[in-house]
Structure formats: structure tokens, C-alpha cells
């Protein structure tokens, strides 16, 4: 127990230490201040702009920024769909894989282009190395950079600056942040035992005299951007539970830090943009405290173990079902909460085997989307709640709501409400449909309360662009591929459109001079109220689902049945 808690504590301390360093660096990149990579990257970026016809000094309006995102994402999706469809004709296919079904290709492309990386296939038996690295690997960089660009544009708008240029933000996000860190991280993973090869599967003879095929590939480079970009899609079906993706405690530590580094740093980046580091730290600690509570809930459940198993065996042991023993209960619980908090979606153990407390924590993260949140977009979601808090507190004291010196009016509240309503709509309605019809019900492997959790988790993971799943669900079917693709698209692009329109609206407003009655958003009291509103809205929206799923399952286990 002590060692497990020490591992969790050490990881969280490192997160706190690197947040201001990386947050300040990200701010310098997007404020176009000098960085250590300027001599190397400036010529490369200028060449990219010249070839693509981008004018770096041209700022975009909200709708221009939105159109740029939609057009580039559509183009990249069509390109990658074609590459996977024709993978049998392309190089780096030593295992001779053919063409997957059209619906699995569609779901995969939609999933990866949106930074969701929900996988209904096994990578080692479905996709060639070219499809994995050149196609999906390409989307891992661009989808992460797209989310990062949205977060930065949103921060710019709230702080009264122009939104910027999407193509510039996309390029700088890749060249200055994602690519350099991924290269360093991939080298570290190779040194620690993660394979990086274009050789085909190995054929070996087992001790019993049988034949076994061992899949391998260019895993290290794929793995690092998977974690750093909050992508989460694994090279292998077992994801980071596979010994080739995550062979030991050292690689697990690197991947855990990579997973949370940018979402945590983005809060500090806001503080630099707004010239209000105090508020950034208050928001950081608000999110951090809720995160630690959820880690404690999940870790306690795993440490106490399954009461039915322990009662039958007459021992008190942690829950080790679905765990890799090289990580144990503590690192698995921390990872499960972190991967759903950051919308990464990678797993180092099976979430389907989590105790109800752990399942509650992971679902809670997927429902709120702000406990760190996704790449860039998580920070934007956090400020949506901040805007609603200002609006509600303004109503209570009879003042016109203001934030960052700008009035919050009907348009902003309508857009903020739309952003928060999209997620429950594309989670709860498809879940109800899936639970009502025999065709979709056939994919559910657990008829009890856990079966409800399997369905809701699948759509919550899709809509929040997380991508993890309770893998007891048989999800590689036409229904699940198409329905989750729709949830992914709506859950990704409708909030992004509304966020950018809201930011554009705020950037155009005149600054209102501060008065003694102006609500200060950088106070402990206001931050506490924000946390309360976040939790209340989350509980009111999704508590019935939590009650029917993990809470009911916990009571059933406690009763001994």
C-alpha cells in the first residue's frame, strides 16, 4: 500500500513542477516570442507557409477559423481513408494485411481525425505499418495540434486578442511543441525497451513445440505522440498494457507524465496570456483537488479489492483482475483516472475490470470534460463553466455579468449553454436507443448494471473525444461503428464551432472599466463557487446514469450478490 501511494504522490509532484515550465513555453510559442527552437524551426515554418500559400500576419475571424478547421480535417480524413483502403498496395506491409471493412475504416478515420482514437479493431492484425504510422500517426499530430489551436484561439478571444490564424497555430503546435517532445520521448522509450522496427511479425517455436506469431513494429515513435497528443489509440489491441508499448515502470512513468503535461500546462498558459498567474494557479488547484479526490476514490476501490472474491478465498487482497502486475493496483488506478481526465483514452489495464468506485471516477471525468480535459479544448470547457459562474453570480447580486473586463450577454450564454448541452444529448440518447433494441443489445456482454455502464461509457468516451472503452462490449459491428462515429463528430465539432464563435464575440467587445463592484474572478471564493457549479451541473445531468451503473453495482457487491 505504501509503495503504491508513493508512486501516485511522486507522479503528482512532477506534474506540479513541470506545469509552469511547459505552460510558459507554450505561451511563448503562440505569442510568437523567442524560443530555443527558433534557429531550427523558423526556416522550416517559412517554407511551409510559402508552399501552402499561408500569410502569417493574416488573422482570422471566428467563422474563418472554423472553416479552416473543418476543411483541413475533411481533407485529412479523406486522405487517410484512402491510404487505409489501399494499404495492400502500399509499402510497409510485411504481414500482407488486406482491406478492412468500410465501416471500420470510417470509424477509425473519424476517430483519429478528431483526436478520439476509439478503436474497434486490433492494430496488429488489421493495419499495415504504413497505415499505422504514415496515416494514423499523421492524424495523431494534426488532431492534437487542432485541439491545441482551438484552446489557444479561445484564450486569445477571452483576453481581448484576435483569434489568430489556424494554419499558423496548427503548424507551430506541431513544430514547436508536439514534434520536439515526441522525438525526445520516443528515443527515451527505445532506450527503455520499446521496439522500433519495420520488420514483420516474428515466428517462434514455443516450449511446447507449437508455433507463435509475435507482432512488433515502429512502436516507440507511435507511442509517444499517442500519449503527448492525448490521442490514446494503441499500436496493439492491448494498448499500453501490452509489454511492447509499455514494458516497465520507467516507461509507464514517462507515458503518465506525457499524458497530463499539456492539459495541465494550458491552464498556466492562460495565466500568461491574461497576465493573471494568480487566477491560473487557483484554477489549477481547483482542478487538481477534484482530480486527487477521484484518484483516491478509484485507488481505494482497487486496494480494497473485490469483496466476493476476497470473501470466497478468505483473504484481503487488492483487485488485480485486468491489471498488469508490473504496474499493480496503484499505477493502474492513477492511469485510469488520468486517461479519462485528460481525454487521452490510453489504458495500461482493463477498465472493464475496475471496481465500481474506479468506474464511477472514470465516468465522472468523461461526463465533466474539464478535469484537465482534452488537448486545448479542455481548457476551453473550463472557461465555459467560468463564464456560467460569472453569469449566475451576477444574477444573484443584480449586476450585469462581466468577465475579463467584457460584458457577458445573451449570445455568450446561448453559446455556452449549447456547448454544455451537446455532450449529454449525444451520450444519453444513443445509449437509450442501444439499450432498447435487440441488435445493439447483442453486443453487451454483461446483462446487469455493468452492462448499462458498458453502453454509456462507449458513447461518453466517443462524445468527449476520449476513446477508451469497457472492452467487454462487442463493438466492431455496423451499429456501434456508425453510431459512435456520429457521436464523435457531433461531440467534437459542434462545441468547437460554438467555442470559437463565443471567443470571437468576446474579442470584439469593448473593455468595461473596473469599479469597486466588479466581480473578481481571481479570488478563492469565486474559484470555490466555480467548483460547486461544475459539480452540481455534472451531478444533475448524469447522476441517474451513475446511479443505474457503478453506484448500483457497488451496492450489489456490498450486499454479497
Curated annotation (Swiss-Prot):
What is the first-listed, main subcellular location in coarse terms? membrane
The protein's location, in the record's own words, is: Cell membrane
Provide this UniProt record's keywords sorted from A to Z.
Cell membrane, Ion transport, Membrane, Potassium, Potassium transport, Transmembrane, Transmembrane helix, Transport
Question: Could you tell me one molecular function GO term of this UniProt entry?
Answer: P-type potassium transmembrane transporter activity
Tree of life domain? Bacteria
Membrane topology summary? Multi-pass membrane protein
GO cellular component terms, A-Z: plasma membrane
Parts of the chain that traverse the membrane: 2-22, 65-85, 135-155, 177-197, 253-273, 280-300, 327-347, 353-373, 378-398, 413-433, 482-502, 531-551
Q: Which NCBIfam families match?
A: kdpA
| Role of this protein | Part of the high-affinity ATP-driven potassium transport (or Kdp) system, which catalyzes the hydrolysis of ATP coupled with the electrogenic transport of potassium into the cytoplasm. This subunit binds the extracellular potassium ions and delivers the ions to the membrane domain of KdpB through an intramembrane tunnel.
Family membership, please give it.
Belongs to the KdpA family.
**Oligomer and partners:** The system is composed of three essential subunits: KdpA, KdpB and KdpC.
What is the name of this protein? Answer: Potassium-transporting ATPase potassium-binding subunit
Which species is this UniProt entry from?
A: Anabaena sp. (strain L31)
Amino acid at each position: 500500500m505504501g509503495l503504491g501511494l508513493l508512486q501516485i504522490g511522486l507522479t503528482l509532484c512532477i506534474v506540479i513542477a513541470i506545469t509552469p515550465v511547459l505552460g510558459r513555453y507554450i505561451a511563448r510559442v503562440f505569442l510568437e516570442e523567442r524560443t530555443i527552437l527558433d534557429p531550427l524551426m523558423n526556416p522550416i515554418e517559412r517554407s511551409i507557409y510559402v508552399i501552402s500559400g499561408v500569410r502569417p500576419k493574416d488573422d482570422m475571424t471566428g467563422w474563418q477559423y472554423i472553416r479552416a478547421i473543418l476543411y483541413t480535417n475533411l481533407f485529412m480524413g479523406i486522405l487517410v481513408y484512402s491510404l487505409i483502403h489501399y494499404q495492400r498496395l502500399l509499402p510497409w506491409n510485411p504481414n500482407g494485411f488486406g482491406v478492412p471493412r468500410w465501416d471500420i475504416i470510417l470509424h477509425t478515420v473519424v476517430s483519429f481525425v478528431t483526436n478520439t482514437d476509439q478503436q474497434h479493431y486490433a492494430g496488429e492484425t488489421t493495419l499495415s505499418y504504413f497505415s499505422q504510422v504514415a496515416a494514423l500517426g499523421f492524424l495523431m499530430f494534426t488532431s492534437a495540434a487542432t485541439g491545441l489551436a482551438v484552446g489557444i484561439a479561445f484564450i486569445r478571444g477571452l483576453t481581448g486578442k484576435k483569434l489568430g490564424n489556424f494554419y499558423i497555430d496548427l503548424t507551430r503546435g506541431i513544430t514547436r511543441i508536439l514534434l520536439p517532445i515526441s522525438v525526445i520521448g520516443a528515443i527515451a522509450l527505445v532506450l527503455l525497451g520499446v521496439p522500433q522496427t519495420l520488420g514483420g511479425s516474428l515466428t517462434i517455436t514455443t516450449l511446447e513445440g507449437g508455433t507463435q506469431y509475435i507482432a512488433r513494429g515502429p512502436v516507440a515513435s507511435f507511442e509517444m505522440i499517442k500519449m503527448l497528443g492525448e490521442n490514446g489509440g494503441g499500436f496493439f489491441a492491448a494498448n499500453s498494457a501490452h509489454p511492447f508499448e509499455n514494458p516497465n515502470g520507467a516507461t509507464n512513468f514517462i507515458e503518465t507524465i506525457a499524458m497530463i503535461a499539456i492539459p495541465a500546462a494550458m491552464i498556466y498558459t492562460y495565466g500568461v496570456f491574461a497576465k493573471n498567474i494568480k487566477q491560473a494557479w487557483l484554477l489549477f488547484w481547483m482542478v487538481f483537488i477534484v482530480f486527487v479526490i477521484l484518484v483516491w476514490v478509484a485507488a481505494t476501490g482497487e486496494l480494497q479489492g473485490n469483496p466476493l472474491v476476497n470473501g470466497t478465498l478468505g483473504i484481503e487482497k487488492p483487485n488485480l483482475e485486468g491489471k498488469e502486475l508490473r504496474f499493480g493496483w496503484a499505477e493502474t488506478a492513477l492511469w485510469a483516472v488520468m486517461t479519462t481526465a485528460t481525454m487521452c483514452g490510453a489504458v495500461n489495464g482493463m477498465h472493464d475490470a475496475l471496481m465500481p468506485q474506479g468506474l464511477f471516477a472514470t465516468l465522472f471525468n468523461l461526463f465533466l470534460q474539464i478535469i484537465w480535459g482534452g488537448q486545448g479544448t479542455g481548457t476551453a470547457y473550463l472557461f465555459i463553466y467560468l463564464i456560467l459562474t460569472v453569469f449566475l453570480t451576477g444574477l444573484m447580486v443584480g449586476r450585469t455579468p462581466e468577465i475579463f473586463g467584457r460584458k457577458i450577454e445573451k449570445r455568450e450564454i446561448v453559446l455556452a449553454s449549447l456547448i454544455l448541452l451537446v455532450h449529454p444529448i449525444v451520450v444519453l440518447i444513443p445509449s437509450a436507443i442501444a439499450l432498447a433494441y435487440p441488435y445493439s443489445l447483442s453486443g453487451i456482454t454483461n446483462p446487469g448494471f455493468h452492462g448499462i455502464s458498458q453502453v454509456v461509457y462507449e458513447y461518453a468516451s466517443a462524445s468527449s473525444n476520449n476513446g477508451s472503452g469497457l472492452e467487454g462490449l462487442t463493438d466492431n459491428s455496423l451499429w456501434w461503428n456508425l453510431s459512435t462515429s456520429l457521436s464523435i463528430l457531433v461531440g467534437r465539432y459542434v462545441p468547437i464551432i460554438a467555442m470559437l464563435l463565443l471567443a470571437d464575440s468576446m474579442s470584439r467587445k469593448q473593455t468595461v472599466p473596473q469599479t469597486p463592484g466588479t466581480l473578481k474572478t481571481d479570488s478563492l471564493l469565486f474559484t470555490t463557487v466555480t467548483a460547486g457549479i461544475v459539480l452540481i451541473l455534472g451531478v444533475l445531468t448524469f447522476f441517474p446514469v451513475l446511479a443505474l451503473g457503478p453506484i448500483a453495482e457497488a451496492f450489489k457487491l456490498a450486499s454479497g450478490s
